[in-house]
Amino acid sequence: MRLPIFLDTDPGIDDAVAIAAAIFAPELDLQLMTTVAGNVSVEKTTRNALQLLHFWNAEIPLAQGAAVPLVRAPRDAASVHGESGMAGYDFVEHNRKPLGIPAFLAIRDALMRAPEPVTLVAIGPLTNIALLLSQCPECKPYIRRLVIMGGSAGRGNCTPNAEFNIAADPEAAACVFRSGIEIVMCGLDVTNQAILTPDYLSTLPQLNRTGKMLHALFSHYRSGSMQSGLRMHDLCAIAWLVRPDLFTLKPCFVAVETQGEFTSGTTVVDIDGCLGKPANVQVALDLNVKGFQQWVAEVLALVP
């Protein structure tokens, strides 16, 4: 039985790998994609997502989502992904268009039509998910769980303590973490370990057309290097769905700091239970790196 999932994303180079795995991993049934502003503007993330769907000839509906965070000015990660979000490869022209409704309403409608609860996967800022939960609370029973790439129990990657996807819209993340839905958090504690080695990266052009495309994108990706290895942050959320045995999780109380001058966007992960609050998130703290790398190679070999 394939697991039905909806994917909320902000492509983004590592998003492209996660999208490939979500489409082609035989255990998963990707039924809806939505885009959000994050790595680059929502117009660019939508264009990039449509380009990828066309590249793989995937007939998956896509809805464009939030262009700005809930309450603050937008920030991006163009320094990591390039100004377009997916520089380095010339995709062919197409005439695909997003659905005519906002992402959170597309998610709501698809949830309400689904014959069983659906797993949501969010690998960008949580703006669309927060809008869904705040504007359409009747949808909560139809959400099996939410798996996110975001946050950290330790160091950050855009401030000393904050990870980009959470820091891009802390108010949205705080709303989601308070919502009461089941959450699995794949943060920097595991994603910084999720490295594709230079030896493997060098084989991609010979793998298939997707390997050639990803190799071209990776030459513009700044989360590591082709010489030292590249971090596949977003792919961890998809990997957990298929291979949860590769991850070590701990139930923790997690809150999001929205006010601090130096700490805004920090996920406060109470690993030791100091606050005495009930756990609201399953936090991934460790990764079987060799197993992850083997799984990635197996999945990408399935992609045409």
Curated annotation (Swiss-Prot):
> What's any GO biological process attached to this entry?
purine nucleobase metabolic process
Carries keyword Iron? no
Q: What is its EC number?
A: 3.2.-.-
Please tell me which top-level EC class this enzyme sits in: hydrolase
Which GO cellular component terms, listed alphabetically, does the Swiss-Prot or TrEMBL entry include? cytosol
Q: Which UniProt keywords apply?
A: Glycosidase, Hydrolase
Query: Could you say which residues form the signal peptide?
Result: none
Residues forming coiled coils: none
**Which residue positions are annotated as catalytic?**
H233
A Pfam family hit:
IU_nuc_hydro
| Gene Ontology MF annotations | purine nucleosidase activity; uridine nucleosidase activity
Stored InterPro entries: I/U_nuclsd_hydro_CS, Inosine/uridine_hydrolase_dom, IUNH, Nucleosid_hydro_RihC_nonspecif, Ribo_hydro-like
Per the record, the domain of life is Bacteria
PANTHER family associated with the record: INOSINE-URIDINE PREFERRING NUCLEOSIDE HYDROLASE, NON-SPECIFIC RIBONUCLEOSIDE HYDROLASE RIHC
Query: Which HAMAP family has this protein been placed in?
Result: Nucleosid_hydro_RihC
Q: Which family does it belong to?
A: Belongs to the IUNH family. RihC subfamily.
Function, as annotated, reads: Hydrolyzes both purine and pyrimidine ribonucleosides with a broad-substrate specificity.
Name listed for the protein in its UniProt record:
Non-specific ribonucleoside hydrolase RihC
Upper taxonomic lineage: Bacteria, Pseudomonadati, Pseudomonadota, Gammaproteobacteria, Enterobacterales
Q: From the UniProt record, report the name of the gene that encodes this protein.
A: rihC
